[in-house]
Amino acid sequence: MRNAVIVDSVRTGLAKSFRGGFNNTRADNMTAHVVNALLERNPKVDASMVEDIILGCGNPEGAQGHNIARNVAVLSDLPIETGGVTINRYCSSGLNSIAMAATQIQSGFYDCIIAGGVESISTSQGHTNMHMYVNDKLAEEVPGIYHAMGTTAEAVADRYNVSREAQDEYALSSQQRCAAAQDAGLYDDEIIPMETKMILKNKETGAEKEVDVTVDRDDCNRPETTLDGLSSLNPVFNPEGGSVTAGNSSQLSDGASVTLIMSEEKANELGLKPMAYFRGFTTVGCQPDEMGIGPVYSIPKLLDSAGLTVDDIDLWELNEAFASQVVYLSLIHISEPTRLGF
């Protein structure tokens, strides 16, 4: 089987949903912008070499529906022959798109694919088609499948004894590390600035107006966060006795990211140095009402298939949306905080 390599990866800044710079920007326009930037900074890769775009999208309907991946291919500087497919595995949709691209390259079906993810919560949340949305049998027998993610985070905290203090401490550490990375310019090379128009709303009158903005950095993190501030926040999903707050949960954000993936042979032919090699991917289902603990089961499966152990991995990224999930996962698998990405 061939090696699949990641050659380059770019993204927009992450903007606060509804209140940030992308609150009036279509998801397909965001993504086409970063696709073009990816092509521009890799001139050895002719656009005609890109055979497909695979995009993950957690809510692929409305303004980000109609097979957004194909729309992006046509909107961008790629030729009409480049295909596009949109996949949905909710929060891991973008990751799954990269895995899908890599495995197709490993299998020899493709040489060069652009894969990534996009989400415009500003233009999609509240605009979902709710016609026949709930399956009555599922709702009765497995109600957790329709729970809000924050409700599942509360279930994890409750069932596995993850304290409010541990969640807030992790959240503070995450904010501090993110701020340090921004200050050190560690994100600068991957973020592609984008000029767009956002909607500003007057809080007193409700009047709205469009203003020109440039999104060139992440604006969702809060560098000024303190432990006292976190501990003062009220629980959101279970006001009576819960522990999941706005401070120890991920924010809602808008943004797009794309990655250039190709066979190692093609990269060598073009004189391109890989950033990384794709080594494996797996999935394991768990009870829907505690969906955030999936990595408890998928990590051992993936390591076993690769013949590795937890200690063989220098840095882990547990990309979960709630501190309760990350704290529990790290207790199970990763005992050294310095080896855990934020």
Residue ranges and their predicted role:
Residues 22-113, 118-136, 191-215, 289-290, ...:
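Conserved beta-ketoacyl condensing-enzyme motif
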Residues 13-39, 59-62, 85-99, 140-148, ...:
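Active-site pocket-shaping loop/turn-to-helix segments
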Residues 1-15:
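N-terminal amphipathic/basic leader segments beginning at the initiator methionine
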Residues 10-13, 24-33, 44, 169-269:
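N-terminal extracellular/periplasmic Venus flytrap/periplasmic-binding protein-like
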Residues 87-118, 157-187, 258-265:
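Active-site-proximal alpha-helical scaffold in enzymes
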Residues 213-246, 252-255, 259-323, 327-331:
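A glycine- and small/hydrophobic-rich beta-loop-beta segment
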Residues 332-342:
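Single conserved hydrophobic/aromatic residue that forms the stacking wall/gate
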Residues 121-158, 220-245:
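Glycine-/small-residue-rich "gating" segment that lines the acyl/pantetheine channel
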